[in-house]
């Protein structure tokens, strides 16, 4: 039993395999079914299970169902029986129209495994539609003179059915004049034609009617009918005639649309429709049909579109008058367009030259032509430009003009010109056109550079750093481009001794001036030179300007004491009688300053004194005077230190040291102090300078000596030791400059009474004031020495 059950199971598996193979093969085929249209819903189409060779339960187990691409369920599958049934009534004409055959494509979907079966359902046509004429009545107008055999086309009938159910033939009811003929066209549609069998006579039979029938090929056949009326048309034996065979009219081109241009008129001797006339344009061009319009009944010709004389000057129109019978007459209408001034002149530029060189006269700037498409005075034109321009218009051939320069232009005055060319016609009203053009003037190197100043004054403080920017010169050139690019240079100095190349330099591009080395006011107070400015034109133009450099003084020199000299030797000793009154002039400190201005203004003050309050120094002239009466208690020897200070910023100073001896009289010579003995050898050398300084004031000196002797005779005092004035040997500096006269010997005079130490007699030395002679632009000194003369005087006290 076990073996038998196993064998049975194997047989079932083999059968199932064959079934699956069969279903797979069936899924690749298309199953066709057919059904007639208009069948009720639920009608049987076919048994799917039987056709597929499947059992009904397999359709149920595999969930078989009908699907379609348009999602309309036109078929349904009964899974209990396997029958395909209609889900709705099918209308072939709605589904396929005139397409034959009408086939619907459906699919049967089965699952486990998934499988699609292609189904084609053909919907068969039934004769459910009759032929139909679109018009129930047809009207034919046939002239009575139509020949026998003439064919007249009739309207065809339409049948929604197809195939044998479509229109098959046409028939007409019996009559004595016509028979029906059917024409088949390439798409198998059939058209009826009416053929004249017997000549018509309007007077005998003005009208006849018959029935036109259309039959299809269905079973039973269906038909449709229409009434055909034939109206016999009387013969038209008179053609229309115009009142004039030729019409001519004029119209302005600016006439408004709808304007009446002309009324043409024709008549016809026939009556009825044969006498009714219709007016039309015959063989008219597209321009005529767009521009004019004719009333078919009244013959009025009106304006339909704007006219343009410049496009078309006249129109020739053939008017056709046609009667109801088809006969016609013709007339010609000539329409002349009158020109009006509706077009402004036109300017056409042929060539233009810009920019133009500024120095070229009679240069052609522009060539242009002018025109006005109007006629007569409307087309006559005049051309002009503004009168205040250096240009002129010259007429050339026909309507060509040239715009030329009237005189050489100056770019620096006007770099560009905006020229308005005005063209005006002579119509009424006058129309004009303006053309604006810009003419650029190119530069020519006709202007030399111009300095902003003819001369420049620069101030430089002395002791400047090398390469210091001391100022700038600037020149402008009215030209443009490279002609206006300026290079600066130093011109050779007029003073050949001026080392200009070592003093200043100039930047060739911007005119900046630089000091090449440090300047010294005391050596060079001012110098002049010329600078040149050259443009880069061809040929190059240049100009020059004068530059004056003033060196400003800096307080770089300390005051220098001329008297008493301070050279490290013993200070000079001054003798003051004890009988001197307050304000007695002891001596005068003479100092100079190599600077100038306020830097050389000197002031004096007593810095140190052995006995304060005994002597005083005048601040402005350096005079040392007694401040009070001398007494016996005052020391005989005093040491004074005088400070000499200038007015610079910061101030500089120097000191002068001198000794003062108080004496009762001059009866005994005063021996030189021990510390002054070594300077005796230098006294003679300085004496020469002192004599030179005092020679010019000898008369004043003698007067002072006499006054001094008179005072001494009146007041006798005890004699004091006599000292000598020790003057160091050495020349005075030659670079000293007197700036104001204060504290110097140039405007005040001073003398000194000295006793030589090597003689037992009293000697006076007369000194001439020192007057230095220093040039403004150089260094030097000129000292004049006068011979020293000695006179011996004996004083008995």
Curated annotation (Swiss-Prot):
UniProt topological domain (Cytoplasmic) ranges: 712-797
Give the matching CDD domains: Cadherin_repeat
Q: Which residues lie on this side of the membrane: Extracellular?
A: 27-690
Q: Which residues cross the membrane?
A: 691-711
- Grouped into one coarse class, the protein's main location is membrane
**What are the boundaries of the signal sequence?**
1-26
List where in the cell it is found.
Cell membrane
* GO BP terms in the entry: calcium-dependent cell-cell adhesion via plasma membrane cell adhesion molecules; cell adhesion; chemical synaptic transmission; homophilic cell adhesion via plasma membrane adhesion molecules; nervous system development; synapse assembly
Whether Metal-binding counts among this entry's keywords is no
Q: Which residues are glycosylated?
A: 418, 436, 487, 567
Where the record annotates domain Cadherin, the positions are 35-133, 138-242, 247-347, 352-451, 456-561, 568-671
Its job: Potential calcium-dependent cell-adhesion protein. May be involved in the establishment and maintenance of specific neuronal connections in the brain.
* Stated name of the protein: Protocadherin beta-11
Classification of source organism: Eukaryota, Metazoa, Chordata, Craniata, Vertebrata
């Amino acid at each position: 039993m076990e073996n038998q059950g196993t064998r049975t199971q194997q047989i079932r598996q083999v059968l199932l395999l064959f079934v699956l193979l069969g279903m797979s093969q069936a899924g690749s085929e298309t199953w066709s079914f057919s059904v007639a249209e208009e069948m009720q819903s639920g009608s049987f189409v076919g048994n799917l299970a039987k056709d597929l060779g499947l059992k009904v339960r397999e359709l149920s187990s595999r969930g078989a169902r009908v699907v379609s691409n348009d999602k309309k369920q036109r078929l349904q599958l009964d899974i209990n029986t396997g029958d395909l049934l209609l889900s709705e009534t099918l209308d072939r004409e709605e589904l396929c129209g005139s397409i034959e055959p009408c086939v619907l494509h459906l699919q049967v979907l089965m699952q486990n495994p998934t499988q699609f079966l292609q189904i084609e359902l053909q919907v068969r046509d039934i004769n459910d539609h009759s032929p139909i004429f679109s018009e129930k009545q047809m009207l034919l107008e046939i002239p009575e003179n139509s020949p026998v055999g003439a064919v007249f086309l009739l309207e065809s009938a339409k049948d929604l059915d197809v195939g044998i159910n479509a229109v098959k033939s046409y028939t007409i009811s019996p009559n004595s004049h016509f028979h029906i003929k059917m024409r088949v066209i390439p798409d198998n549609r059939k058209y009826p034609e009416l053929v004249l069998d017997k000549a018509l006579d309007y007077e005998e039979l003005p009208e006849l009617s018959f029935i036109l029938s259309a039959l299809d090929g269905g079973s039973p056949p269906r038909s449709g009918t229409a009434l055909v009326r034939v109206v016999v048309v009387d013969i038209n034996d008179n053609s229309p005639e115009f009142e004039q065979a030729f019409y001519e009219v004029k119209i302005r081109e600016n006439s408004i649309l709808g304007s009446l241009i002309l009324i043409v008129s024709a008549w016809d001797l026939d009556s009825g429709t044969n006498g009714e006339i219709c007016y039309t344009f015959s063989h008219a061009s597209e321009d005529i049909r767009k521009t004019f319009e004719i009333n078919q009944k009244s013959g009025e010709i009106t304006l339909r579109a704007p006219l343009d004389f410049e496009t078309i000057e006249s129109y020739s129109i053939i008017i056709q008058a046609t009667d109801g019978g088809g006969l016609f007459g013709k007339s010609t209408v000539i329409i002349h367009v009158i020109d009006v001034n509706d077009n402004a002149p036109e300017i056409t530029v042929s060539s233009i030259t810009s920019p133009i060189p500024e120095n070229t006269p009679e240069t052609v700037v522009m060539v242009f032509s002018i025109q006005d498409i109007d006629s007569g005075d409307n087309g006559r034109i005049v051309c002009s430009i503004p009168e205040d321009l250096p240009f002129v218009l010259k007429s050339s051939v026909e309507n060509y003009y040239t715009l030329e320069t009237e005189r050489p232009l100056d770019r620096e005055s006007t770099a560009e010109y905006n020229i308005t060319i005005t063209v005006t016609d002579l119509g009424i009203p006058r129309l004009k056109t303006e053309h604006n053009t810009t003419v650029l003037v190119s530069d020519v190197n006709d202007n030399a550079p111009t300095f902003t100043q003819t001369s420049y004054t620069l101030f430089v403080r002395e002791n400047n750093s090398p390469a210091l920017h001391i100022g700038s010169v600037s020149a402008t050139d009215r030209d443009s481009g490279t002609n206006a690019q300026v290079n600066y240079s130093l011109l050779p100095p007029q003073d050949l001794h001026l080392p200009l190349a070592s003093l200043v330099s100039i930047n060739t591009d911007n005119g900046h001036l630089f000091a090449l080395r440090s300047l010294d006011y005391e050596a060079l107070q001012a110098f002049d030179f010329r600078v040149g400015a050259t443009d880069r034109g061809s040929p190059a133009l240049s100009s020059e300007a004068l530059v004056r450099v003033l060196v400003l003084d800096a307080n770089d020199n300390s005051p220098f004491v001329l008297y008493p000299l301070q050279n490290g030797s013993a200070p000079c000793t001054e003798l003051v009688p004890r009988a001197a009154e307050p304000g007695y002039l002891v001596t005068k400190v003479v100092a100079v300053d190599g600077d100038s201005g306020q830097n050389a203004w000197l002031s004096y003050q007593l810095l140190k004194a052995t006995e304060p309050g005994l002597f005083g120094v005048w601040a402005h002239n350096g005079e040392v005077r007694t401040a009070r009466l001398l007494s016996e208690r005052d020391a005989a020897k005093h040491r004074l230190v005088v400070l000499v200070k200038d007015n610079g910023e910061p101030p500089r100073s120097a000191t002068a040291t001198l000794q003062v001896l108080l004496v009762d009289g001059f009866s005994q010579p005063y021996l030189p102090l021990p510390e002054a003995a070594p300077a005796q050898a230098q006294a003679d050398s300085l004496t020469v300078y002192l004599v030179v300084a005092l020679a010019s004031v000898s008369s004043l000196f003698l007067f002072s000596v006499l006054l001094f002797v008179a005072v001494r005779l009146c007041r006798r005092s005890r004699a004091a030791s006599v000292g000598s004035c020790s003057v160091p040997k050495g020349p005075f500096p030659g670079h000293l400059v007197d700036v104001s006269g204060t504290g110097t010997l140039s405007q005040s005079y001073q003398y000194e009474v000295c006793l030589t130490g090597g003689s037992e007699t009293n000697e006076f030395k007369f000194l001439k004031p020192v007057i230095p002679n220093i040039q403004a632009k150089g260094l030097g000194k000129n000292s004049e020495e006068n011979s020293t003369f000695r006179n011996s005087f004996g004083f008995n006290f």
